[in-house]
């Protein structure tokens, strides 16, 4: 599953996990008792829950260029080309309980690593909304780095 997720990140594509519970599907590549997200006793397979709770950006205030999530450390990185004509914020999803239970550091910088000061930021539950307020015609690459404590 993790290999598929990394490939989806590399090619900036979305994905969905559809095997909710075991159906004894002979076409699956999973080993016995590994189909679905639940164990045979009905408990959640925690490693799959963590694998499926990756940090990602749902909406970009521009064009996505690159995204990476480290499954072991939960560090997240993304780059996008800023489009000042977009009035809505970018929306980042993060699972605080599974990946950032001790908190996190969010950095929003340009491609050279300089902090972008003109940012409206709002955090709600497992979402971070951020809107860059720079000149609408400015050519700007925005880098997002989320690092767990």
Annotate the PLM regions.
Residues 118-149:
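Beta-strand-rich ligand-recognition modules
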Residues 1-97, 103-105, 109, 137-141, ...:
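Aromatic-rich peripheral "rim/lid" segments of glycoside hydrolase catalytic domains that contact
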């Amino acid at each position: 599953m993790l290999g598929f997720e990394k490939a989806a990140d590399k090619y900036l594509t979305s994905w969905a996990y559809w095997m909710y519970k075991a159906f004894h599907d002979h076409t699956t590549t999973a080993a016995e008792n590994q189909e679905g997200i639940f164990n045979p006793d009905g408990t959640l397979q925690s490693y799959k829950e963590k694998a499926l709770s990756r940090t990602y950006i749902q909406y970009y205030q521009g064009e996505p260029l690159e995204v990476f999530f480290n499954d072991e450390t939960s560090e997240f990185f993304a780059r996008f080309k800023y489009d000042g004509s977009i009035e809505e914020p970018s929306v980042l999803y993060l699972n605080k309980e599974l990946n950032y239970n001790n908190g996190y550091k969010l950095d929003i910088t340009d491609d050279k690593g300089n902090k972008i000061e003109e940012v409206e930021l709002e955090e709600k539950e497992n979402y971070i909304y951020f809107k860059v307020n720079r000149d609408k015609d400015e050519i700007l690459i925005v880098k997002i780095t989320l690092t767990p404590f």
